[in-house]
Amino acid sequence: MDLWSTRSASLELLDSELAEQRRSIETAFKLIDRGIDFFNEHAPNDQYSRICALALAKARNYAHGAYGMILDNLAQEAGALMRPFLEYYELLIYFAKDPSRVSEAAEDRLPKAGKRAELIGSDFKGFREYLNENASHSSYSYHSMRHQIDFESMSIRKTQDFAPEPLFRNLGDLFAQLALLAFQTAISVSVKDFQAGVELSLEAESLRDEGGGHFRLDERLSKTPESSP
């Protein structure tokens, strides 16, 4: 039994045809790491930095886990990790809008995720509901189960084979979310050091434009639901 054959094939593609895409994802992680490093420097004497470092590190962990699952062609299951990723991303927004809110986290009295999303004017309600219905909880919905079924033989797949096109698409989805987190990292840093935040934001903007081109995100966004495959 080879549990890693799909991941190995994905990694081979990332070292060849998708090398630019791999570098874009790695650059996003590097920008996020710089944010964690910044907060670590200030954490000993600053609660905002400690709480933001924790939120950013947790978001990074979930994204890293999702990355590995995507390489295994388990992107649907990786959605279960993107739900808490989104919560930590929105927590960073919540704290940046009012830094005094970090005391709520320190005292374990944060409002519910839905309430926080409402307070920050989150645009991700639909995405959150999709993840809840199809990824974060047990479900027999079409979106949850379709990849498990071999419709030719009507049998249940034990594993997911390597598939280049879904890999490219799913990595693009991950990159888009990492780019959002990189921008929010810059905003969160700017609360403590405006210039450092500006520098990070400029690099995040460059990453968004370059990586977005590598993943053809504009082309994907321009497609209407009727024209999408």
Where is each model-derived feature located?
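Short, charge-rich amphipathic alpha-helical segments embedded
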Residues: 34, 87-103
